[in-house]
């Protein structure tokens, strides 16, 4: 069993700008910081990062990626515990713990259905901590943006001229209605959702306007548990939440852990936050302390 402990933001970051390039939700379809324990056979169509153990039955990864890839399309900091046959359909699988798999098919061109794409590496715990810091920072940044769009009558609408539309809604209101989206002149929409324990009983469907999955981000910045229920359109940022669903994600997902059985399709979040100059180290550390921006590092019991 593993656990997370607090980690300081490295001093090297203090002299840099924040988010000068696309973030992890562009690079990965699925990121979890603890175990991946799907309740059914999970298919992830893009890249995957798992900060804990890989559990579940007969998971499949990299379904929609180029089979000529040889980079690590799946990274698991902990143990490989999945039952049945694990399939890596493009690229390789890197892991940091023990390999307890009963069967593996590496279906990329370089591996020919063998198990040769698996390799053990070090440093994935540190990468998990870095990814958490980055995505927690993005979530806090997005949550602090002023709302520029309107919410009501089952519609998210934007009438401004900026490239980014920002909406605010409570989880209770979100999961009490069907919704449509009208971004107007904006290319991207961020929907900040408040609430700690959130669940869609099946009453909520995302209808017209949600078809461009790469341009929508749901920021569940307070969530500890989240069940989105039906097919969810757009990327989901819920770094401290245990997430579940009984349908598919049409976008990237970043969560504490994932216990659902829907597929995660390869529609990465397409927006890059603006370049932001960080304040002096002492000011920054006080700010991060106040916001609760703490890194997480996975430690393994002896």
Regions found by a protein language model. Name each.
Residues 90-91, 95-146, 159:
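Contiguous hydrophobic, core-forming segments of folded domains
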Residues 1-8:
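Bacterial N-terminal signal peptides that target proteins for export
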Residues 299-302:
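Short, charged juxtamembrane terminal tails flanking transmembrane helices
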Residues 279-297:
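A short, hydrophobic C-terminal helix/tail in secreted or cell-surface proteins
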Residues 15-20:
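N-terminal signal peptide c-region/cleavage motif recognized by signal peptidases
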Residues 23-89, 130-275:
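Long, polar low-complexity repeats
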């Amino acid at each position: 069993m593993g656990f997370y402990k607090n980690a300081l933001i490295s001093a090297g970051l203090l002299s840099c700008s924040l988010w000068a390039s696309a973030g992890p939700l562009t690079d990965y379809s699925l990121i979890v910081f603890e175990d991946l324990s799907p309740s059914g056979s999970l298919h992830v169509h893009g890249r995957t990062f798992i900060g804990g153990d890989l559990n579940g039955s007969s998971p499949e990864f990299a379904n929609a990626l180029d089979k000529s890839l040889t980079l690590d399309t799946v990274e698991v900091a902990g143990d490989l515990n999945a039952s049945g046959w694990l399939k890596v359909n493009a690229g390789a699988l890197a892991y940091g713990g023990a390999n307890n798999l009963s069967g593996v098919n590496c279906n990329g061109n370089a591996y020919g259905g063998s198990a040769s794409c698996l390799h053990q590496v070090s440093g994935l715990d540190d990468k998990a901590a870095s990814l958490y810091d980055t995505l927690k920072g993005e979530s806090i940044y997005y949550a602090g943006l002023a709302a520029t769009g309107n919410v009501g009558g089952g519609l998210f609408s934007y009438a401004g001229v900026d490239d980014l539309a920002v909406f605010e809604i409570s989880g209770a209101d979100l999961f009490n209605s069907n919704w449509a989206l009208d971004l107007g002149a904006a290319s991207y929409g961020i929907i900040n959702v408040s609430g700690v324990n959130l669940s869609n009983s099946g009453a909520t469907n995302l209808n017209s306007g949600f078809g461009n999955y790469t341009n929508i981000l749901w920021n569940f910045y307070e969530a500890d548990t989240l069940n989105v229920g039906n097919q969810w359109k757009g990327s989901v940022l819920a770094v401290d939440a245990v997430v579940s669903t009984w349908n598919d994600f049409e976008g990237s997902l970043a969560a504490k852990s994932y216990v659902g059985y829907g597929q995660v399709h390869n529609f990465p979040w397409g927006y890059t936050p603006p370049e932001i100059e960080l304040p002096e180290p002492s000011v920054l550390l006080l700010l991060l302390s106040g916001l609760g921006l703490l890194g997480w590092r996975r430690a393994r019991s002896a």
